[in-house]
Amino acid sequence: MQAQMEDFKIKEEIWIEKYRPVRLNQVAGQEETIERLMSYVATKNLPHLLFSGPPGVGKTASAVSIAREIFGEDLWRENFTELNASDERGIDIVRNKIKNFAKTAPMGGAPFKIIFLDEADALTSDAQSALRRTMEKFSSNCRFILSCNYSSKIIEPIQSRCAVYRFRRLSDKAIRERLEYIAKEQDLSITDGGYEALIYVAQGDMRKAVNSLQAAAFIDVEKPISRETIYRTTATANPEEIKNLIETALRGNFRVARKELNRLLYEEGLSGEDIVGQIYRVVSEMDNLMILDLGLSERDIVGLVDIIGETDFRLTEGASEKIQLEALLAHFALSREE
């Protein structure tokens, strides 16, 4: 076992870095966006860019790949800098780090430098206003690539100066193909259930999928990575358990549902917010057969989603997980009698 662990450590580096795309055509699941970005690279005529979309869908990989392809492997690091706005939200990041890099000339005869500002929607309004002025002042020798989860949080004057690209959540197919490639490279054995669990946990986030796979690989060194291993290492309940919990409550068996809830909280160690999130996924994805079997109407589904949202809000405000989740199950149990 010791030898296997040593072999595992020799192989190991962070897989999201090891398997990060280095060329635009390696970015998964964003074909239309990548095609347009490649046209900028081909002409080396790059506007300011704004990448919008959820985490783990290729925004950072695309920005780095653009720099690699425009400047080449010898010069891209000298002409590219990456900053994270969530580390410093105020105006100082613009006045100091961004301006200091922007005002220096490009290296090696490059036409311009690139500043990649990740999580730009974390910047305050004042910082964004200062950034807008900096973009104008240094546009002759510097291009900005901004990345955000929500483009609505970026002020209009910045949006109007950028070509905006929206990165969508990755499809199950795109995630599975990438995971299968990594599994082959790492000589891993993964069951079909393991792949399904990774896709379920990831929710379209490639970074989360790869991190979850690496965590599971460290646990199941000697055997195929299974569905159970993925759920255990990611602190995720089996979707079937959540489905049974909901069905039990909706059929009026509150005590049984509460017992299962306590098992998930105290034996499995799941957080209240995670459980609420999974309950929402099951309710929102209920198929017609399940709805018919439980005798639910459209109005019932609307009511369930409403109370789930209220419970989620209360948990984020610091309310007791046990009380709020039991109240949620009680509402489910009573909903059939209303």
From Swiss-Prot:
Q: List the GO biological process terms.
A: DNA repair; DNA-templated DNA replication
Which Cys-Cys disulfides exist here? none
List the CDD domains.
AAA, HLD_clamp_RFC
Read off the InterPro entries from this record. AAA+_ATPase, ATPase_AAA_core, DNA_pol3_clamp-load_cplx_C, DNA_Rep/Repair_Clamp_Loader, P-loop_NTPase, Rep_factor-C_ssu_arc, Rep_factorC_C, RFC_lid
Q: Which residues bind ATP?
A: 53-60
Query: Cellular component terms, GO, for this chain's entry?
Result: DNA replication factor C complex
Q: Which GO terms describe its molecular function?
A: ATP binding; ATP hydrolysis activity; DNA binding; DNA clamp loader activity
Keywords of the record, alphabetical order, are:
ATP-binding, DNA replication, Nucleotide-binding
Q: Which Gene3D superfamilies match?
A: 1.10.8.60, 1.20.272.10, P-loop containing nucleotide triphosphate hydrolases (3.40.50.300)
- Subunit arrangement? Heteromultimer composed of small subunits (RfcS) and large subunits (RfcL).
Q: Give a short account of what the protein does.
A: Part of the RFC clamp loader complex which loads the PCNA sliding clamp onto DNA.
Which PANTHER family does the UniProt record give? REPLICATION FACTOR C / DNA POLYMERASE III GAMMA-TAU SUBUNIT (PTHR11669), REPLICATION FACTOR C SUBUNIT 4 (PTHR11669:SF20)
Q: In which family does this protein belong, per the annotation? A: Belongs to the activator 1 small subunits family. RfcS subfamily.
| Official protein name in the record | Replication factor C small subunit
State the organism of origin: Methanosarcina mazei (strain ATCC BAA-159 / DSM 3647 / Goe1 / Go1 / JCM 11833 / OCM 88)
Instruction: Give the gene name.
Output: rfcS
